[in-house]
């Protein structure tokens, strides 16, 4: 159980940090700013910290006593964990980038081509996109922590982890406060999101759950 929980926390943190690195890398290569250093600091201190600790409190999985003894030579990435970290990081990167461009499209009054979107000059549109990217990334990582309760079993077959629910509520409240309290929003260079933009960000973030559930189902079928 202890070793399992350590691996879950490591996989969560690595996939989350990979998503942040890839998001910044793609934005830099395309020539725009999607997140500022203070945003990443907030995500690493607030969004990632509490769920990682909560995963360490996870109960043992039901089939844990039916597993074969673990090979002492196996590394921390054994059993396909490295692959899972990679594709899950790419998944969170994709929803974050989609959130940014959704913010631009929701704000700009006219149709814009790809070049105009990448090199946006409207300050309000850029701030809206950046705010949506931040909120989507924050919540996607929170929801992804629920995926990490088991590497193969469905989230919906697991019992409750009150610590993880508490971490989610705390992160949701704090991340929302940053968007809507004027002094904090100004410090983070955010703009208040409309109901549509807030809902779109939440929907994009939630998408990580069905995607991971689908992949887990395929993995269970392959290894049956």
Model-derived regions: residue spans:
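Membrane-embedded transport module
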Residues: 1-152
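C-terminal transmembrane module of polytopic membrane proteins
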Residues: 56, 135-224
